[in-house]
């Protein structure tokens, strides 16, 4: 089946998904419809509709659009079936029921931002960096009954550099994933796909790691961990949602304090308790960890903008107490 004849439906929501949809359109694939989430309401009175990035793209390219609240809604299923789809492509969308993923004649495949079976779940990029992985990647696989467990179609990997954070890896995988989506689509249509089962028992010495959704309480920094662990934790949550701690002022008040960038610091007094702040109040802020000190480079005080530590110290040095 040729690219121009195959009827493809794309399902997705954020910017990460737009790159894949744009790649399919750019390669001449026949995307007959797009499915995304319902509009959100923003503004003082929740009166301003906020479109998902995928909806914005679909509207600008005049692609038919569906925005179901429930994926088993009879009206939605009727409209989806009317598109007479050959293949569905899913990137950063919701969990699909069988009645949806089993509808196309050629099936439904998903792009996942990890090297499956590792890091199944909602936040694979974050957890790979938090856990100190040296590489990650993208996987395309056919959907089945369990989350992120279907047969693998293709994978591509990239190194995680010491200077990377969740934002830089997100962008790299977004474009790498778009290329893999195009390749996977081509292989499916040409009948050249060779499927690989996800074998959790063939990981060697590696443990199976998961990537659950990240909530605010998970993002709090534990200063009792090593410098390396804290450094990976912070960059794994940067720029979003951001690792945080509580800054204790001289008056005893506490404020949420986000940290986006760090590096290993020179040694100070090892007798200092974990969480103690060491600063010249002009250039640097170092914090005692389990095995040394970590230097903060980019921070954000609650209610303020994100900024380099040198800028923060110009107006807020008086806030620093003895510890976080």
Curated annotation (Swiss-Prot):
Q: What reactions does this protein catalyze?
A: L-methionyl-tRNA(fMet) + (6R)-10-formyltetrahydrofolate = N-formyl-L-methionyl-tRNA(fMet) + (6S)-5,6,7,8-tetrahydrofolate + H(+)
**Stored InterPro entries:** Fmt (IPR005794), Formyl_trans_C (IPR005793), Formyl_transf_N (IPR002376), Formyl_transf_N_sf (IPR036477), Formyl_transferase-like_C_sf (IPR011034), Met-tRNA-FMT_C (IPR044135), Met-tRNA-FMT_N (IPR041711)
Which EC numbers does the record give? 2.1.2.9
Q: Does the keyword Protein biosynthesis apply?
A: yes
| Database matches in Pfam families | Formyl_trans_C (PF02911), Formyl_trans_N (PF00551)
Q: Which GO terms describe its molecular function?
A: methionyl-tRNA formyltransferase activity
Is Secreted tagged as a keyword? no
| List of residues binding (6S)-5,6,7,8-tetrahydrofolate | 114-117
Instruction: Alphabetically list the UniProt keywords.
Output: Protein biosynthesis, Transferase
Gene3D superfamilies the record matches: 3.40.50.12230
Which of the seven top EC classes does this enzyme belong to?
Answer: transferase
Naming one, the record's GO cellular component terms include: cytosol
Describe the task this protein carries out.
Attaches a formyl group to the free amino group of methionyl-tRNA(fMet). The formyl group appears to play a dual role in the initiator identity of N-formylmethionyl-tRNA by promoting its recognition by IF2 and preventing the misappropriation of this tRNA by the elongation apparatus.
Q: Which HAMAP family match?
A: Formyl_trans (MF_00182)
Q: What family does the entry list?
A: Belongs to the Fmt family.
**Cross-referenced NCBIfam families:** fmt
Q: What is this protein called?
A: Methionyl-tRNA formyltransferase
Q: What lineage is on file?
A: Bacteria, Pseudomonadati, Bacteroidota, Bacteroidia, Bacteroidales
